[in-house]
Each structure stands twice: as structure tokens, then as C-alpha cells.
UniProtKB/Swiss-Prot annotation:
One of its GO terms (molecular function) is ATP binding. The record marks 33, 255 as: Transition state stabilizer. One of its GO terms (biological process) is L-arginine biosynthetic process. Catalyzes the ATP-dependent phosphorylation of N-acetyl-L-glutamate. InterPro entries: AceGlu_kinase-like_sf (IPR036393), AcgluKinase_fam (IPR004662), ArgB (IPR037528), Asp/Glu/Uridylate_kinase (IPR001048), Glu/AcGlu_kinase (IPR001057), NAGK-C (IPR041727). It comes from Cellvibrio japonicus (strain Ueda107) (Pseudomonas fluorescens subsp. cellulosa). This is Acetylglutamate kinase. CDD domains: AAK_NAGK-C (cd04250).
Length: 301
């Protein structure tokens, strides 16, 4: 069955619109944080995997970093291990860390690897412990109430922050035409494992790789102003101002701060995109309009 003239022209227009972007980004590295609603449902999962495979086929170097908070919570519940959060971070004792490693480094990581491979890619899964990819240190959290004379330092267990990234491991995989899929688990100097926020890991990997783009898939349509309008293009100075005036607050603040730090650290652009949209990654990279918020270091975005 042949296409109608209108359908054929629509396909041709899409391809020609994508061409300059393909030419511009060939050979460039793009770090994509996969999580949230984008991980739920077979259709969105396959949409994401095909986007990643197509990026590789047209000469880009996608690097996937994934989360897995709901899956961790589900297994902890089955094992009757209590989940506790402080400042949005999971308190991670030794028993919880074992579960985190099983879920992130085992189940979720291999599911994503399999998903990409089934859609025609060549993915290899690893955690930050492999090849000492992610060197981490213990994250300390402070807590203060008006009644306290000095802030209290809280121990939240095996929760870490990125100290350094061994980019040679990632470069080796990229140069061998593999797609790295990375679980956000770091390793300390003493060999201890650390649970690290996946957005922060993605941002730091993008920074150390000097990536062209950092893309964070979220459950919202992008960064919004106080009237609920999506802000499609922002400079780092504009983002700083939106944080200062309270437009960016709450749960969105850590994600935006991660994107902001990456761009200030040398990543060309960061993108907050709606993971609930089919082929959101391709639409953001290869179309003029995009489907989210672009943050750059340019005076005007």
C-alpha cells in the first residue's frame, strides 16, 4: 500500500528538518538520564530505545544513565525493609545498599540493555564500580531548625556524591560502537558502594566527558514560569534568576541545579524534556521546536 502524497510529504519534511541537526551532532556525545514515566509502559520504553539506537546509527554517541527508585522501593517492601527519606534522599544502610545494587546494577540495568539490544543497538551495562568508573565520597546532610544553635550533621548511610569519572571506560565502549548504560552506583576509596542520585551522576558524567548535551527525561513538559507556560530556551543567568525569585522550587530544584551545574561545567546544553512523550529524545534533538526546556551558557537562549 502506497502512501498518500500528504503523508509522503510529511515524512520528507521531517527528514529534511532533521538533516542539519544530524550533520551538526555527528560525533558528539549526548548523556541521557532515563527514568520516571519514560520507564513505565512498553510503548514508551521501546520509543526511548529506538531513539537511542537511531542516535548511534546517525553518528552520535549516546550514553544512558538510569534511575530506579520505584523498583528499589518495591523490593524493599517485599523484603520488609523500611524505606526512610531525608531531604528527598533515601537513607541507605548496608541492607538497603545490597538491595540498591541488586535492583540498579542487576534488574533495571539489564532490562534497559536488553531493551536497546532488541531494538537493534549494541548496549553494555555497567555500574560506577566497574573499572572504577564513578569514584564517590560519602554525602553528608545537615539539618537545622530555628531552635537549634548549630546545624546537625545527619548520617544517611551509603549515600554518595561523585568525586570523579573514569572517562576512559566510557570512551573505550563508545569507540567500539557500544552504547554504555550506567547504573548510578559509585565506589569509595575503601571499596565501599554508594547510592548516588541518577540526575547528579548523569550531570557529572556529561561534565567529565565534555558532552554536547545532557538530557534529563522528566514527568513534566519542561520548566514552567509562574503562569504555567513552558520556558523553551534559557541562559544560565536566567535560570539563576528564576531560582532566586522562587519560580523554580521544590522537587524540580535539584534537577534544574544539576542541569545548571553541568552547563556551567562545560556541557554545551542541558535539556529538561517530557519523558511521557513518544520519541521525546529525537524530537528535542532533531526538530526546530523541541519538546522541553533548553539551558545554555549563551547570554540569550
Amino acid at each position: 500500500m502506497s502512501l498518500s502524497r500528504e503523508s509522503a510529504m510529511n515524512i520528507a519534511n521531517v527528514l529534511t528538518e532533521a538533516l542539519p541537526y544530524i550533520q551538526r551532532f555527528t560525533g558528539k556525545t549526548v548523556v541521557v538520564k532515563f527514568g520516571g514515566n519514560a520507564m513505565e509502559g512498553e510503548a514508551l520504553q521501546n520509543s526511548f530505545a529506538r531513539d537511542i539506537v537511531l542516535m548511534k546509527l546517525v553518528g552520535m554517541n549516546p550514553v544512558v544513565v538510569h534511575g530506579g527508585g520505584p523498583q528499589i522501593g518495591s523490593l524493599l517492601e517485599k523484603l520488609n525493609i523500611k524505606s526512610e527519606f531525608i531531604n528527598g534522599m533515601r537513607v541507605t544502610d548496608s541492607a538497603t545498599m545490597d538491595v540498591v545494587e541488586m535492583v540498579l546494577g542487576g534488574t533495571v540495568n539489564k532490562q534497559i540493555v536488553s531493551l536497546i539490544n532488541r531494538n537493534g543497538g549494541q548496549a553494555i551495562g555497567l555500574t560506577g564500580k566497574d573499572g572504577q568508573l564513578i569514584r564517590a565520597k560519602k554525602l553528608t546532610v545537615t539539618h537545622k531548625t530555628p531552635e537549634m544553635l548549630a546545624p546537625e550533621i545527619l548520617d544517611i548511610g551509603h549515600v554518595g556524591e561523585v568525586q570523579s569519572v573514569n572517562t576512559a571506560v566510557i570512551d573505550m565502549l563508545i569507540n567500539s560502537d557500544f552504547i554504555p548504560v550506567i547504573a548510578p552506583i559509585g565506589v569509595g576509596e575503601d571499596g565501599a558502594s554508594y547510592n548516588i542520585n541518577a540526575d547528579l551522576v548523569a550531570g557529572k558524567i556529561a561534565e567529565f566527558l565534555r558532552a554536547e548535551k545532557l538530557m534529563l527525561l522528566t514527568n513534566v513538559s519542561g520548566l514552567q514560569d509562574k503562569q504555567g507556560n513552558v520556558l523553551t530556551g534559557l541562559s544560565t543567568e536566567q535560570v539563576d534568576a528564576l531560582i532566586a525569585d522562587g519560580t523554580i522550587y521544590g522537587g524540580m530544584l535539584p534537577k534544574i541545579a544539576c542541569a545548571l551545574d553541568a552547563v556551567k561545567g562545560g556541557v554545551t546544553s542541558a535539556h529538561i524534556i517530557d519523558g511521557r512523550v513518544d520519541h521525546a529524545v529525537l524530537l528535542e534533538i532533531f526538530t526546530d521546536a523541541g519538546v522541553g526546556t533548553l539551558i545554555t551558557n549563551k547570554p540569550k537562549a
